[in-house]
């Protein structure tokens, strides 16, 4: 049975002649399977139908056509050779085999593309899970840092309160000891006096207490309040700075100047007062201040 050439087989399967010749040429004329692989891999290339610069007949290794031969010797030799002619049944059988081969190649290509798509999807999901895990870890770290900061601030506040309580207890003990010693040193009335009217004990003038800390509560314009413990010798400017840093406005916004007022007696503190210590301003051991927006001068 005569066989179709690779070029004829590709044309029989529906490939354009120019594309089939190009496939055979670029695969080194290694057969129909190699040419079919090339055709399926490059069917979407924009230049798949562009002709090669080298004559395809030289690359394919086929004999030149009678019109390409020069001289009477060429035409005579072409006329003397006869090409085997396939019967219709042989042509159909060979075409069937080629179509089955094309279908097999197509299935292999689809399976390969499906595997690649599945692998890309797995990669996408894996990257998504890694990104989600990284975001969750970042959120957990932020929550943990915020909780640690709150615990630290609360511990500092409790420690400050404890120091104030201990100071108060020490002062009470000192006063009690001093007061008790004065009463014990007084002489009792003579026994011969039948019934002297007891005189009230002489009151010692209260000892002026020196505080080293003061507790300031600041009421903000929105109704909220801030409470903080300062050293008695700190300047009032430290309180104003604390208010400006903690009054809850968004970072980056223009903040109005802060004006501090005392509730009772009513008093507006000036810029000169900002340089004076809290003890000198009468804000020790505790005081309530009011924040008002300072009108620009």
UniProtKB/Swiss-Prot annotation:
Biased composition (Basic and acidic residues): 86-122, 137-177
Domain UBA: 2-42
Region (Disordered): 38-212
The UBX domain, residue ranges: 209-291
InterPro entries, sorted: UBA (IPR015940), UBA-like_sf (IPR009060), UBA_UBXN1 (IPR041923), Ubiquitin-like_domsf (IPR029071), UBX_dom (IPR001012)
UniProt-annotated location(s): Cytoplasm
Keywords: Acetylation, Coiled coil, Cytoplasm, Phosphoprotein
Coiled coil: 86-172
Acidic residues bias spans: 42-52
Pfam assignment, any one: UBA_7
Chief location bin: cytoplasm
Positions where N-acetylalanine occurs in the chain: 2
Modified residues (Phosphoserine): 199-200, 270
Subunit structure: Component of a complex required to couple retrotranslocation, ubiquitination and deglycosylation composed of NGLY1, SAKS1, AMFR, VCP and RAD23B. Interacts with HOMER2. Interacts directly with VCP. Interacts with BRCA1 and BARD1; interaction takes place when BRCA1 is not autoubiquitinated bur is strongly enhanced in the presence of autoubiquitinated BRCA1.
PANTHER family, alphabetized: UBX DOMAIN-CONTAINING PROTEIN 1
Entry function: Ubiquitin-binding protein that interacts with the BRCA1-BARD1 heterodimer, and regulates its activity. Specifically binds 'Lys-6'-linked polyubiquitin chains. Interaction with autoubiquitinated BRCA1, leads to inhibit the E3 ubiquitin-protein ligase activity of the BRCA1-BARD1 heterodimer. Component of a complex required to couple deglycosylation and proteasome-mediated degradation of misfolded proteins in the endoplasmic reticulum that are retrotranslocated in the cytosol.
Protein name according to UniProt: UBX domain-containing protein 1
UniProt source species: Rattus norvegicus
Gene name per UniProt: Ubxn1
């Amino acid at each position: 049975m005569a066989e179709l050439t690779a070029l004829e087989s590709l044309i029989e399967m529906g490939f354009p002649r120019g594309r089939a010749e190009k496939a055979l040429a670029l695969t080194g004329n290694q057969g129909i399977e190699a040419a079919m692989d090339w055709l399926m891999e490059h069917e979407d290339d924009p230049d798949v139908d562009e002709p090669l610069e080298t004559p395809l007949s030289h690359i394919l290794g086929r004999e030149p056509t009678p019109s390409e031969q020069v001289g009477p010797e060429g035409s005579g030799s072409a006329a003397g050779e006869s090409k085997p002619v396939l019967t219709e049944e042989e042509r159909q059988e060979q075409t069937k085999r080629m179509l089955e081969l094309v279908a097999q190649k197509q299935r292999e290509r689809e399976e390969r593309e499906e595997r690649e798509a599945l692998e890309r999807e797995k990669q996408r999901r894996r990257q998504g899970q890694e990104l989600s895990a990284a975001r969750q870890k970042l959120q957990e770290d932020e929550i943990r840092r915020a909780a640690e900061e709150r615990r630290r601030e609360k511990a500092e506040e409790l420690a400050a309160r404890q120091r104030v309580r201990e100071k108060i207890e020490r002062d009470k003990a000192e006063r009690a000891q001093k007061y008790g010693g004065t009463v014990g040193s007084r002489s009792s009335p003579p026994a011969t006096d039948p019934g002297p009217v007891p005189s009230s004990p002489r009151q010692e003038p209260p000892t002026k207490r020196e505080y080293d800390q003061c507790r300031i509560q600041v009421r903000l314009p929105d109704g909220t309040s801030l409470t903080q413990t300062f050293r008695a010798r700190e300047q009032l400017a430290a309180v104003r700075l604390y208010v400006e840093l903690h009054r809850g406005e968004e970072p980056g916004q223009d903040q109005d100047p802060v004006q501090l007022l005392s509730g009772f007696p009513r008093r507006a503190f000036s810029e000169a007062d900002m340089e004076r210590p809290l003890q000198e301003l009468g804000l020790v051991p505790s005081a309530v201040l009011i924040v008002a927006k300072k009108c620009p001068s």
